[in-house]
Each structure stands twice: as structure tokens, then as C-alpha cells.
Amino acid sequence: MNTDPCVHCGFCLPTCASYRVLGTEMDSPRGRIHALKAIEAGELQLDATVAKHFDSCLGCLACVTACPSGVRYDQLIEATRPKLNAPELRTPVERAFRKLLFALLPYPNRLRAALTPLRAYAGTPLQALARRSGLLRLLGPQLEAMEQLLPPLAPEAFREAFPQVVPAQGERRARVGLVLGCVQRLFDPAVNEAAVEVLSANGIEVVIPPSQGCCGAATHHQGELAQTRELATDLMASFAGVGPLDAVLVAASGCGHTLKAYGSILESPSAAGFAGQVADIQQFLAELGLSETFRAHLAPLNHPDGTPASAERPLQVAFHDACHMLHGQGIREQPRQLLAAIPHIQLREAMEAGVCCGSAGIYNLVQPEEAAELGRIKAADLAGTGAELVASANIGCSLQLRRHLGEGDFPQPVLHPIELLQRSWRAGRA
């Protein structure tokens, strides 16, 4: 691991989410790099106490963007994560909880089976009563955090909704594969529905292998290398034999960041070739361009009070920059370009757009207190824009934002930008 470029200037500190809420040098990129140097020199032991300072890192990569010396902290923390999974560095409870998460989250069919009994609970008055009663605290902070993120479960989450090939409407402009994501297809299936509809309406044929599973993002971000490689290999295999594709698209930035890293994860030319085809759906649509037919049918969206947006009263939308999109993939302008195509939308920028919301894969489950504080900070920042709704292009962020925006007096809806395009397109065809 090359820690030499770090000159300990401290430019990373104001951008670091863990340093913001914990306030200690060891919980900052600079402090962790100093610790890595000491470990490498034999001056410091990687024990359970030191490991906690690495575990406090969200992996948001804001420090990489901020660093004037080009320190690849992302590579340093990724190389360190597998070492943190040594049994002696975690308590039995921590190991058991992580084992549960990694046995469920990356496997859509298992997760669907686990969620089935909760369909009569999630999003109902019973759930609201349980939350108000304080009884959920008896579950412990980690299980309580899981419950706090549990959204209403749509019927579409419990069936495979798409054919293997969705044809392009009109002249075909491109042919793409679509990665559905494991958490997204269950907790927010409307996003994938919108993605398929918007792509097809723009003359893009969509291929959706029914056998596809998890891309490995959750395990990748936690250093579970063997499981990540297995999941990545299986996902690539599900796209084998589907024919030539112009791109492999994904509508969740956390997944996209991992998919684009398949070359280094699997260390093979075929994986690098697959990764080279991966694009965020917004990145792809912005670069290809919305079709003239699609643009012609985009209509104003409604305000929360039901009245349509207008030039005199535009719909105020705050765009949330997910860390693995902004810092991990360098995507910032493309989502804003797509949203600007909708008539009478006015984008409101958050004051601290580059600061993590606290979701960070499974961070808000394994580090619930720190994640909740970051969630409250981000919710206050977005609410302070005066926006009527929030656009978020990552499922983990969306769940986190809905939880913490919902704690306010005037909670804003959180929707994927592709859902807003779909709604505008439908309104123009009504």
C-alpha cells in the first residue's frame, strides 16, 4: 500500500463524514493513513481498538476528491477492509450480525422470502405504532436501524415483473442490459419499472437476464472478497449469451461503482471488458441524448398540492449527490441535465452536496448511531434548500433520506430522477 503521497495537509478533514461526527484524528483519512504507516513499520498492532477506527470509515471517497496530492485513499481502505474481517477484531455479536446481512442482502430470493411475513407490517399503522411506542429499542441498535429503514413493500417486489427483452419504441437507437440490483428490486421496484419504460420510450431495447443476482456491492464495500468475486462471476455469467450490447446499465450508483471495478476485483480481461460496458443509466441517457419524440412529450409535474408546475411557480427539486456517483464515478452534471429537460423544474443545490448521508452500503446498519447523525445533518441540509421533493439515484441513500426527512415537520418525497422523467413522460401522453 502506497501511503507516501500523503503530506498530512488536512484538506481531507472537512470533507470526512466520520471525522465530522466523531471528531477524532484517528477517525479521519489522515489519521488512518498515519495508522497504516505505523502498522507497516511494525510500530502499531492492528487490534480490535485500531480496527474500530477503520470500521468507522464510510468509504464515501470524498477525501479522494478533496486531496490535492492525489492520495488514493480509496485503494488504501479497500486493501485494508479484508483484514478487518479477522474474527479476533470483532465481537461475536458483530460477526453474527454481519453474517446475517451477507447471507440475506446479496440474494434476492432469500431476501424476498425473509420479507414476505413483513408485508402485513411494513407501511401500516402497526409499524407506526411500534415506532412510537419505543418497543423497537428492545431489539438493539442494529436491528432497530434495520426496522427504521424498512419501507412499505410493494406487490411488485414479490414477483419478477419484466420479460427478458423489452423492445425499443420506434427506431432502435441502442441495445442495453439492465442490472436490477438486489435491494432496489425489493425495496423500490418502481425505479426499475421507470428505467425500463424510459429506456424503451427513448428507442432503447432493454435486455434483463432473469437469472441475474447481486452485483456484489454490499460485500465489496466491506472487504468480503471471496463472496464478492463469486457474486460478480455469477452476474457476468447471467449476461453471457444475450447477444451484443451497447452498454450494461444500472440505476443504483453503489452498484455501478462496484460493477465498474470488476476488472480489478476479478483480475481478468473478460471482467475488465464487462466493466468497460457498465454505465449509470443517467450517464448513458445524457450522453446518448433523449430522443426528440420523448422530449416532445415531457410535461410539467405536479406540486405536492396537486397543481401543475408552471413558469411562474416551478417545481423545486433538490438533487442528492450519492457518494459513489459523485466521488466514486465522477458523475455530477448528467442527472441534472436530464432533470432540466422536464418543463418548469428548478433545481435547488444543497450547501454540503459532497457530504455523505450516512447510508454507505451497510454502514447505517452496522454503525447506526454515527449513520443516524449524518442522516439528520443531510436531511436538514436538503430541507434547507426549500425544495418540494428530493431526487436521489441510489437506493441506500433513498432509504436513509426517507427515514430522516420523515422525521421533520414537512417531509419531502424522495424519488429517483428516472422516476421523475417517467412521470413527466406519462403526463405528456395522458
For each predicted feature, which ranges?
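Iron-sulfur cluster-binding cysteine motifs and their immediate structural context
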Residues: V7, F11-L36, A51, S56-K83, ...
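Iron-sulfur cluster-binding electron-transfer modules in prokaryotic oxidoreductases
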Residues: Y73-A430
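Polar helix-capping/helix-linker motif
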Residues: S28, D47, L104-P108
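Short, flexible helix-adjacent loops and helix caps
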Residues: V21-T24, A41-L44, L290
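Alpha-helix C-capping/helix-to-loop hinge sites
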Residues: Y19, I39-E43, Y262, L326
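Generic start-of-chain signal for non-secretory N-termini
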Residues: M1-D4
